[in-house]
Amino acid sequence: MIKQYLQVTKPGIIFGNLISVIGGFLLASKGDIDYPLFLSTLLGVSLVVASGCVFNNYIDRDIDKIMERTKNRVLVKGLIDPKVSLIYASVLGIAGMLLLYVAANALAMMLAVIGFVIYVGVYSLYMKRKSVYGTLIGSLSGAAPPVIGYCAVTGQFDTGALILLLIFSLWQMPHSYAIAIFRFKDYQAANIPVLPVIKGISVTKNHITLYILAFMVATLMLTLSGYAGYKYLVVAAAVSVWWLGMALRGYKATNDSVWARKLFVFSIIAITSLSVMMSVDFNVHSSAVLLTYAG
């Protein structure tokens, strides 16, 4: 039973988000790490992400049973009562948000709430099923964790937080489109209006290329604005150029599914590399404050 309650939270997604939280937190810490705050932030974000994933599993029960990769999920197979899953998700979410408020600050909690509402309320309940722009909306919630980590330290939404939001939002797009290409038949069968299904794979390749170019610019801004060092810059430039090269090779790909899967795998390598580098190669910087909270 414990295994099922763990599976429904999508541990892989939680782990991936924690890597970005660590990157944002350590970038803002600049070597002066508050370990109790660090652990509390990781736990708080984990609980909120887990809550969102459980709600998503509940909402998507009808389409999950159609898709090959999701047909064996816990709620689809009836291993957990749907009503119980709602209570479970609510408890996880409330606990995570309260922890962020108490241990970090109101801004970190507010960002978690915004990310949660976008993912569950806007994306999962409506945009995913109704609009080709669902991926774009979902990318905002996917970019929330590193910004939460950053703001848990600073207590303010400054230029650094905005750049992180841009980097991770832009990264989400080619990452998600790659999944939509190699899982094309699943999305088509479930009638989910992702870009490859609605506009075609050729158009999606153009979008992937443009988003990677924008991602490249955003990653460099972290150094150019004085938040990260030149070692980070070298790694950011290298992974961005390599990722762009992979995207361009897609125009000559004989098997779009194989190409998209490789692009997807490298997207994970790319964002993990950036998260690690911003954690260790930071600059002390006088930030431009965009939003702050005192209380």
Swiss-Prot record:
The chain crosses the membrane at residues 8-28, 35-55, 74-94, 98-118, 132-152, 162-182, 208-228, 233-253, 264-284. One of its GO terms (biological process) is heme O biosynthetic process. GO terms for cellular component: plasma membrane. It catalyses: heme b + (2E,6E)-farnesyl diphosphate + H2O = Fe(II)-heme o + diphosphate. One of its GO terms (molecular function) is protoheme IX farnesyltransferase activity. Pfam families: UbiA. It is an enzyme of class 2 (transferase). Keywords: Cell inner membrane, Cell membrane, Heme biosynthesis, Membrane, Transferase, Transmembrane, Transmembrane helix. It is found in: Cell inner membrane. PROSITE patterns: UBIA. Pathway: Porphyrin-containing compound metabolism; heme O biosynthesis; heme O from protoheme: step 1/1. It is a multi-pass membrane protein. Its EC number is 2.5.1.141. Converts heme B (protoheme IX) to heme O by substitution of the vinyl group on carbon 2 of heme B porphyrin ring with a hydroxyethyl farnesyl side group. Carbon 2 of the heme B porphyrin ring is defined according to the Fischer nomenclature. Belongs to the UbiA prenyltransferase family. Protoheme IX farnesyltransferase subfamily. This is Protoheme IX farnesyltransferase. It comes from Yersinia pseudotuberculosis serotype O:1b (strain IP 31758). The lineage of its organism: Bacteria, Pseudomonadati, Pseudomonadota, Gammaproteobacteria, Enterobacterales.
